A protein has these predicted regions:
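A cross-family signal for N-terminal binding/gating loops and helix N-caps
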Residues: 1-217
Length: 217
């Protein structure tokens, strides 16, 4: 059912951006105005500048948060602040955090997913969407020609759990700890056999969007 593919990920260059904790940001829809300003102060390369840039009183069609983000993305790529991986990969992501005084781990994979109409029930929603946030994310997508944040989806398949566990024993390509104490580790899975196993595990089932309905639409 769900068709997934590896892709060439873009990420911060650790040789030029040593403190990854200073450049990561939360999802756009939970960033308050105060948090936005703090993230700007934290680093000239904080990702909020692309994901949810500041608006100004002088914004216009040719100079606004979307055009500024587009210009900045091009600059970061030209300056090697951001690097594009040579090989397509499935990216394994482990997040460790504390919730209600309990230590938790969230494990996921970041992949490309073929867009499907809701009526096909391949990708399934659980909530409606609003025009304003949908328009905001679409404007950013058009300006950058890139996705700045993933759509969080759920699926159940215990068959690939051992494969992901094996991959997680290797050295992560990226590792960071947020100011709130959450730790993140990312591995790039590039072996064709491993990628095929992951693709096959999802080929017979739907996936359920947990967060990101506006961006999917």
């Amino acid at each position: 059912m769900a068709e997934i593919r590896p892709f060439h990920g873009v990420h911060f260059n650790k040789a030029l951006v040593e403190d990854l904790a200073a450049v990561i940001c939360p999802p756009y829809d939970i960033i308050t105005p105060e948090m936005q300003k703090e993230l700007y102060r934290r680093s000239d390369y904080n990702f909020v500048r692309l994901e949810f840039g500041l608006e100004t009183a002088h914004d216009m069609d040719t100079d606004n948060r979307y055009t500024r983000a587009s210009k900045m993305l091009r600059q970061w790529l030209e300056q090697d602040i951001l690097l594009r991986d040579d090989k397509p990969a499935v990216y394994l992501h482990d997040q460790h955090f504390t919730h209600k005084w309990k230590k938790c781990r969230r494990r996921g994979i970041t992949v490309l997913v073929r867009l499907e109409e809701w009526s096909k029930m391949v990708v399934r929603p659980h909530e409606g969407t609003l025009t304003k946030p949908r328009s905001d994310r679409l404007n950013l997508l058009w300006a950058l020609q890139a996705n700045t944040s993933p759509i969080l989806a759920l699926f159940e398949d215990r068959k690939i759990a051992p494969l992901l566990e094996t991959q997680a024993k290797g050295e992560p390509m990226l590792e960071a700890k947020s100011v709130k104490g959450e730790s993140h580790r990312v591995w790039a899975i590039t072996e064709p056999e491993a990628i095929n196993r992951i693709q096959n595990s999802l080929s017979h089932q739907p996936i359920y969007i947990a967060d990101g309905h506006h961006r999917y639409e």
